[in-house]
From Swiss-Prot:
Catalysed reactions, semicolon-separated: alpha,alpha-trehalose 6-phosphate + H2O = alpha,alpha-trehalose + phosphate
GO biological processes: trehalose biosynthetic process
Named cofactor requirement(s): a divalent metal cation
Record EC number: 3.1.3.12
InterPro entries on file: HAD-like_sf, HAD-SF_hydro_IIB, HAD_sf, OTSB-like, Trehalose_PPase
Organism field: Oryza sativa subsp. japonica
Name of the featured protein: Probable trehalose-phosphate phosphatase 10
Length: 359
């Protein structure tokens, strides 16, 4: 993803200009995540990132500008957002890939910048903060390297938080205490541990089944298996789909979902990033609290479950990170990780100012 430029032009905020652009936008519908891995679904979930700023004129792509009428920039709408947070505790939920780090061709190279790490650390010191990713929990921690956060890997099926913060995590029947390489005790909640042997078996089968496909990468994310096809020629995407489905059809307790140039095999259980948000709010003793404003920032279709939870409950805001116009359950948008970093900086600054005024 990339904005191909810095800052938002004043033209972006001109309601009259947006009205003029409205007829250029085709109706955008949030498509369901099909479970058959067809080529159509792979293309649908993997739109090509676009340059949303014209390098010569500095103006926004007209279709993207019109799209932001429905999903306003969270930076431009910042005062409106924090107005809802006045006097409330803000709970921050963040995706990793494409949100805190750029999307890269090699998944193992999705490195978080030192500047972003410091911004996230500062946010976590002032706000309860969690990272919810499709990656394995340990892998996300290896990227982020911050002990102040909650981590939810495998789309929220594997959750870790510092011991001593909130007892409700360890009191859950699926929770355990552990001492990890982070250097301190942690609380761990895991949904669907009975699926682990099955996931490991599918991982091995997929490595063997796809070994002849150039560019494919199979990733074991503990509670799910990811089949990355970002580096596969599009003419071979159907082959990736077929190999994945050939393995999956003998595992009725597993299902297939789509991410950005990735097929993901997960347990058939009622758990997703939205459920993880609800669980974490409960663990933070914020589930029934009216004085809380949850904010979820993510870029992937798997983040839609979290956006939907906040929207349906009318209790928080989802912010979609995208340079491509697409329908979403989010209420606001940001273009790329650089705008995410700016939003987080402003959020912490605002929270500090509010705290100083209340003293």
């Amino acid at each position: 993803m990339g904005s191909c430029g810095n800052g938002r032009s004043s033209e972006y905020d001109d309601p009259a200009s947006l009205e003029k652009m409205e007829e250029l936008v085709l109706p955008l519908k949030l498509m369901p995540l099909h479970t058959n891995g067809r080529l159509y679904d792979m293309r649908l979930s993997s739109p090509t990132a676009t340059c949303v700023i014209n390098s010569s004129s500095g103006s926004f792509d007209p279709i993207y500008r019109a799209w932001t009428k429905k999903y306003p920039s969270a930076l431009n709408a910042f005062d409106h957002i924090v107005a809802y947070g006045k006097g409330k505790k803000i709970a921050l939920f963040l995706d990793y890939d494409g949100t805190l780090s750029p999307i890269v061709d090699e998944p193992d190279n999705a490195i978080m910048s030192d500047q972003m790490r410091e911004v996230v650390r500062n946010a976590a010191l002032h706000l309860p903060t969690a990272i919810i990713s499709g990656r394995s929990r340990d892998k996300v921690f290896d990227f982020v390297k911050l002990t102040e956060l909650y981590y939810a890997g495998s789309h929220g099926m594997d959750i870790m938080g510092p011991v001593g913060e909130h007892d409700s995590v360890t009191n859950h029947r699926s929770s355990i205490n552990s001492n990890r390489k982070q250097g301190k005790g942690v609380k761990i909640f895991q949904a669907g541990t009975e699926f682990l042997p099955m996931i490991n078996e599918v991982f091995r089968l997929l490595i063997d089944k796809t070994k002849a496909i150039d560019g494919v990468k199979i990733e074991n994310n503990k509670f799910c298996v990811s089949v990355h096809y970002r580096n596969v020629e599009e003419k071979n995407w159907q082959l990736v789909s077929q190999c994945t489905n050939d393995v999956l059809k003998v595992y009725p307790r597993l299902r297939l979902t789509h991410g950005r140039k990735v097929l993901e095999i997960r347990p058939v259980i009622d758990w997703n990033k939205g459920k993880a948000v609800e669980f974490l709010l409960d663990s933070l003793d914020l589930a029934s609290c009216k004085n809380v404003l949850p904010i979820y920032i993510g870029d992937d279709c798997t983040d839609e479950d979290a956006f939907k939870v906040l929207r349906d409950d009318k209790r928080g805001f989802g912010i979609l990170v995208s340079s491509v116009p697409k329908d979403s359950h989010a209420l606001y948008s940001l273009i790329d990780p650089s705008e995410v970093m700016e939003f987080l900086k402003r959020l912490v600054m605002w929270k500090n100012e509010e705290a100083s005024h209340n003293k």
